[in-house]
Amino acid sequence: GVPCLCDSDGPSVRGNTLSGIIWLAGCPSGWHNCKKHGPTIGWCCKQ
């Protein structure tokens, strides 16, 4: 999947670990949405 920035990773992509994965159809079972706002397409989820 495509990595994305969770709210817990920090304010910006620069210098932070991207611990989330973008899912287009919502987070799969056992995962949770880790970003309150965005990304524009899909959900940023993490296990």
Curated annotation (Swiss-Prot):
Keywords, sorted A to Z: Disulfide bond, Ion channel impairing toxin, Nematocyst, Neurotoxin, Secreted, Toxin, Voltage-gated sodium channel impairing toxin
Any one of the GO CC terms: nematocyst
Pfam families (alphabetical): Toxin_4
Disulfide bonds, paired cysteine numbers: C4-C44, C6-C34, C27-C45
Compartment(s) where it occurs, according to its Swiss-Prot or TrEMBL record: Secreted; Nematocyst
UniProt-recorded Gene Ontology molecular function terms: sodium channel regulator activity; toxin activity
Alphabetical list of Gene3D superfamilies matching this protein: Anthopleurin-A
BP-aspect Gene Ontology terms: regulation of signal transduction
Keyword Disulfide bond found: yes
Similarity remark: Belongs to the sea anemone sodium channel inhibitory toxin family. Type I subfamily.
Reported function: Binds specifically to voltage-gated sodium channels (Nav) (site 3), thereby delaying their inactivation. Has a strong effect on crustaceans and insects (DmNav1) and a weaker effect on mammals. This toxin is highly potent at mammalian Nav1.1/SCN1A (EC(50)=6.01 nM) and Nav1.2/SCN2A (EC(50)=7.88 nM). It also has great activity on Nav1.5/SCN5A (EC(50)=49.05 nM), Nav1.4/SCN4A (EC(50)=109.49 nM) and Nav1.6/SCN8A (EC(50)=about 180 nM) and is less potent on Nav1.3/SCN3A (EC(50)=759.22 nM) (when measured as the increase in the slow component).
Name of the protein described by the UniProt record: Delta-actitoxin-Avd1c
Phylogenetic lineage: Eukaryota, Metazoa, Cnidaria, Anthozoa, Hexacorallia
